[in-house]
Amino acid sequence: MDKKLSYTFECCLKELEKRKAESPGDIYDSMYNQISFIRDCVERGLSIDEELAGRSLNFHLLSGRNLAGPGDKELIESISTITEFLMEYSG
């Protein structure tokens, strides 16, 4: 994993961890768990598709529905970068 992507994962997960503490519930937990899963697969050299075993990722949909405020810009950008990585990875 390159340094930029690693930093993106780190920033995204750190912000989601903060939001989980501030607003407990399923949304931030789900986003955190999915992005952490992707990062772990990439770090270990595992196939994300194989590890998903037919399940799907929806963190990008959750972010689109729940992140719209001015304070969400950096998190949205991080999630967009991770989504772009996944599109290239799968393509």
Question: Over which residues does each language-model region extend?
Answer:
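Short terminal alpha-helical segments
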Residues: 1-31, 83-90
